[in-house]
Amino acid sequence: MLAVQDLEIRIGARLLMSGVNFRVDKGDKIGLVGRNGAGKTTLTKILAGENPPSAGTIDRQGEIGYLPQDPRTGDPEELARTRILNARGLGDLMVKMTQATEDMGSIEEAIFDRGMKNYSRYEDEFQSAGGYAAEAEAAAIASNLGIKESILSQPLKTLSGGQRRRIELARILFSNANTMILDEPTNHLDADSVIWLRDFLKSYTGGLIVISHDVDLIGETVNRVFYLDAMRTVIDVYN
């Protein structure tokens, strides 16, 4: 949930918007539209907590999944698969389970015993977090976004910008976030993946704010449109 009160946004001396008030509750799906330079991306960065507003308050409750245009977060050494699974705390557990399995193959009794003990503990935590069913769900999301198995096995630092963006989108969709803020989520997706994403967002029950030049995605997934005009400092709302 997001509650915005008396929001003001400036870039240098330029006033983009002021006196902005709105809420995003469960089931609210908002499309941000307007010409380039109207402040759509700037607004989403502020709503997500990436940048502060010039004035006003934003109350954020629950988990927020934010897809920027150029994702840079995450450990560059982390595998793409681990990045996605860690949205629910599963990725690091799988790494620990793998290490415990390797320890269980040791001929040294102390290392073997440590591996047995650790594997049992980590697997219990893994299952409590959704386990193999959640892992399969993450794999299905990745596949539907056109992410190949070979990409999932690579560290983030080796991925192209488009691949990195799809990994981040998959992570957010897998996260069960209460509110999603997506800046041009169809970028770098093929036609089949775009259709799948539309269906996913239509069935999503949380709050959604999306910037997109995909008219069909906006038309099929949102129930309110916020129009930003670079020449005015207000947001026009259409249901």
What function would you assign to each model-found segment?
Residues 1-239:
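ABC ATP-binding cassette signature C-motif
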